[in-house]
Amino acid sequence: MSKRDFLSTADLTRAEVDDLLDLASRVKGKKPGQVLHGKTLGLLFFQPSLRTRVSFEVAMVQLGGHCINLSNDDLYELEPQEQAVMDGAAEEHVKDAARTLSRYVDALGIRAAARSGDWARDRQELLLRSYARYASVPVINLETSFGHPCQALADLMTMREQLVSLRGRKLTLMWCNHPEPKSLGPTHSLLQVAALAGMDVTLAHPLGFEIDDEVLRKGRATAQDAGGALRVVNDREAAARGAEIVYARSWGAPKYWSDAEREAVVKRSLQDWRVDEALMATTQNALLMHPLPVRRNVAATDAVLDGVQSVIYEQAANRAHVQKALLMQLLK
């Protein structure tokens, strides 16, 4: 029997997303019992994690399974390229690590969101895709520089809970300032599922902070096919006006991917790109969302993060429920 991986929201149909979120809602309302008794999930984190790590551990335990966590310090430096001459720093090939771990665990989760400085390389998700290629068990994307599908599904679940029907609802996905260049993963994945749901999506960012060209192009086509829309604006106030959801997120620009110092200089003039009470006052009493962690009073102010329209903790809680549903689909 062929295995199923969970690598990208771009691989999902509308029906598959709906089925998974429907299952997540049922799981949230009623504990499913020990349906994964005897199953083991291996999690490999090459970057720090709080919500992803804990929510997957909790999900697996509540389903009766077991979870093993390995961080970057626990792992050898890996070589993802096929037929590489391994006379450099890499101690082990991904092929050997993936095939070995497949003998121990029933599924693997990989977080590999490192920034190499080469966007053309990082957008290929080489480490994640290499694990998926060589592992004989399901591989789950826990975030790369290019995608974060688990976060996006929890985001969509939260929107469904708050607004019920999503088709035509106005989502503003807004770039916010941050002292570091962050992954585009949450932005790309949310845009993909929001377009699939037929939402009216406004992507707002300063000039120079465009997302990946292919993701934007496919997102527009998906939105049109689903009865929604996707537009890009470079004015934060115009983007927020009339929004029903404001999703704040920082991301590093592919344009500056090889020059973080230059990006930092550019962002000094963009400190007004944050979500505050004045901006939220122009919306349709919009929900405020953020995937966390958040730089308070840089990306968004305390007043809006702690305000009555904020659903950031509901988002975080729904990570566990979405991931329980995902694990049940992959392993049950």
Residue positions per predicted region:
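Phosphate-coordination loops involved in phosphoryl transfer and adenosine-cofactor binding
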Residues: 35-41, 167-169, 285
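Glycine-rich phosphate/diphosphate-binding loop of Rossmann-like nucleotide-binding domains
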Residues: 46-66, 160-248
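Adenosine-phosphate binding glycine-rich loop
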Residues: 285-287, 291-332
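Positively charged, low-complexity intrinsically disordered leader regions
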Residues: 1-58
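Phosphate/diphosphate ligand-binding glycine-rich loop within oxidoreductases
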Residues: 36-44, 50-160
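Short, conserved loop/helix-junction motifs that constitute active-site signature segments
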Residues: 166, 195, 278-285, 307
